[in-house]
A protein has these predicted regions:
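Active-site beta3 strand of CheY-like receiver
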Residues: 52-58
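C-terminal output helix
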Residues: 114-123
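Charged docking surfaces used in two-component/phosphorelay signaling
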Residues: 23-31
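Receiver (REC) domain active-site loop signature in two-component systems and cognate sites
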Residues: 63
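Short hydrophobic/Thr-rich beta-strand motif most characteristic of the beta2 strand and flanking loop
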Residues: 33-40, 48
Length: 132
């Protein structure tokens, strides 16, 4: 049984071209108290990130137009979001993909399909410690 993680008020952006992945991530995160911002691809995410200021970003690698590596690099190059944790999502679990993710500044790599536990653990691990 998963312990109840309280992530109340944490703002999470999920960038994935798969509606199924976006929806399942949203359900898991909302159940834990997060505010969720969804984006269909890198361009959509870059248009929304400045308005929403997420605390953490989950970014799919394989997306049309702007892939996850390019999206992560652009987020990290922006001085306002340079310290925002970016976690790559991929159905591939290769060493090369992980290394490439690190090169563009990602903080972690989560393999799809992810579980509720692995998603929430990633959020809790990478959030700045909040004083309660």
């Amino acid at each position: 049984v998963a312990e109840a993680v309280n992530l109340g008020g944490v703002k999470v952006m999920v960038i994935d071209d798969s509606n199924t992945i976006r929806r399942s991530a949203e359900i898991f995160l909302v159940q834990a108290g997060c505010q969720v911002v969804l984006a269909e691809d890198g361009f959509d995410a870059l248009a929304k990130i400045a308005d929403h200021h997420p605390d953490i970003v989950f970014c799919d690698i394989m997306m049309p137009r702007l892939d996850g590596y390019q999206t992560c690099a652009l987020i990290k190059k922006n001085p306002r979001f340079g310290v925002t944790p970016v976690i790559m999502l991929s159905s591939k679990d290769g060493l090369f993909d992980r290394a490439r993710g690190r090169m563009v500044g990602s903080d972690e790599y989560l393999t799809k399909p992810f579980t509720k536990d692995s998603l929430l653990k990633a959020v809790a691990t990478h959030l700045p410690q909040r004083v309660s």
